A protein has these predicted regions:
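A short alpha-helical cap/connector motif
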Residues: 1-139, 143-165, 171-217
Length: 217
């Protein structure tokens, strides 16, 4: 993969800036039906991937020439801004909370990212249709439960999506997530898996004998 470009990295880091960090948003958590009041600045700190990881995804997409990207879990659209800045021609990102999705849409409009589309609705309701994008890379960062991860993988298989790369964020989020990752690594269907700690990377049906790598990242 191309080397780390400090100038390019710093240019992309600007996406982490929240324009109105004290803006308060209110929404209902769709899973737990809990009313949430939080500032956009705090929400960004709570859910956003590290700059290092987002830049890694950007480089991965460019290096492997991926053109269609599907992200599960938009939040404020910070990570998707990195994806939208890559050479990918189409980026679809799914967000289940309408109030948050609207903020992401506003961000992409200001960036003039016409090739980035926010898919509103719970991911379990929108994932199947979104696979119609025929993504080269799928980034999963919406639901940190093993049952959700295996549901994503099952739907991908059922719909015979020829995705080249699946990235699962936060594989060390919990014992449950790590157990799921270990099960994926042991699955013969996934011939190439890579653990970079912040995420697990799967290359389904890669034409090699089964291999797994752990990379300090």
């Amino acid at each position: 993969m191309h080397h780390w470009d400090e100038e390019e990295s710093e240019k992309l880091r600007q996406f982490r800036t929240i324009e109105n960090p004290n803006q308060v948003i209110k929404y209902t958590d769709p899973r737990y039906l809990e009313d949430i009041t939080i500032s956009t600045g705090r929400l960004a700190r709570k859910v956003t991937s590290s700059h290092k990881f987002s830049y890694f995804l950007y480089k991965l997409i460019n290096h492997l020439g991926f053109e269609r990207i599907l992200e599960a879990g938009t939040s404020l659209g910070i990570n998707a801004s990195y994806l939208g800045s890559s050479k990918a021609k189409r980026v679809w990102t799914m967000e289940g909370i309408e109030e948050i999705a609207d903020l992401a849409i506003e961000r992409f409009e200001k960036l003039e990212f016409e090739h980035v589309r926010v898919v509103k609705g719970l991911v379990e309701h929108t994932f199947r249709d979104s696979l119609g994008l025929n993504p080269d890379l799928i980034f999963i960062d919406a639901d940190h439960r093993s049952e959700a991860i295996f549901w994503y993988l099952r739907i991908i298989k059922e719909m015979n999506v020829r995705v080249q790369c699946i990235v699962i964020h936060d594989i060390y989020w919990s014992h449950d997530m790590n157990k799921a990752w270990k099960k994926i690594v042991a699955d013969d269907r996934y011939t190439l898996t890579i653990d970079i700690f912040e995420a697990g990377i799967i290359f389904p049906n890669y034409p090699i004998e089964k291999q797994h790598f752990t990379i300090k990242f």
